[in-house]
Amino acid sequence: MSDIKSLDDLKSVVGEAPVAEVAIAREPVRDSLGRSYATGKRKDAVARVWIKPGSGKVTVNGKPMDEYFARPVLQMILRQPFKVANVEGQFDVMATVAGGGLSGQAGAVKHGISKALQLYEPALRAALKAAGFLTRDSRVVERKKYGKAKARRSFQFSKR
């Protein structure tokens, strides 16, 4: 072993182990009705989402999307995963969402749709992951501290 002076010498003696770069082949996950199920979370909202092939109808808590999320911005948030994956109007979505406000609920449904899409069609995973839709947005409201008016705001200071 004393004849090994550099890293190249060591590699020639030991031999380089072949590095196996195997992409994991993911199988589509569907239930007996041909649907994919996923949960999405955002702030305090939790959404349970089922998707199946269809005409693009989105139902949230038993109501059409445009009735439950009246603001166009929230409707746009729900459509983002379909635009990124280039599958607009190909899936029906049935979601139940609870907790939080409307913005958090829209984010939770979007997260759930993204996760369900990649379970239904694993080939869409790369596009959804690149857009950041499969990552749980961990930002939540900061807690209020004692001795402060809010989380960070101090009480008014009076010099005299």
Swiss-Prot record:
GO MF assignments: RNA binding; structural constituent of ribosome
InterPro entries: Ribosomal_Su5_D2-typ_SF (IPR020568), Ribosomal_uS9 (IPR000754), Ribosomal_uS9_bac/plastid (IPR023035), Ribosomal_uS9_CS (IPR020574), Ribsml_uS5_D2-typ_fold_subgr (IPR014721)
Any Gene Ontology biological process: translation
Family matches, as Pfam families: Ribosomal_S9 (PF00380)
Recorded coiled-coil stretches: none
Alphabetical list of SUPFAM superfamilies matching this protein: Ribosomal protein S5 domain 2-like
Gene3D superfamilies, per database record: 3.30.230.10
Organism domain of life: Bacteria
Keywords per UniProt: Ribonucleoprotein, Ribosomal protein
GO cellular component: cytosolic small ribosomal subunit
Ribosomal protein is among the record's keywords: yes
Family: Belongs to the universal ribosomal protein uS9 family.
Name recorded for this polypeptide: Small ribosomal subunit protein uS9
Organism of origin: Cereibacter sphaeroides (strain ATCC 17023 / DSM 158 / JCM 6121 / CCUG 31486 / LMG 2827 / NBRC 12203 / NCIMB 8253 / ATH 2.4.1.)
Organism lineage: Bacteria, Pseudomonadati, Pseudomonadota, Alphaproteobacteria, Rhodobacterales
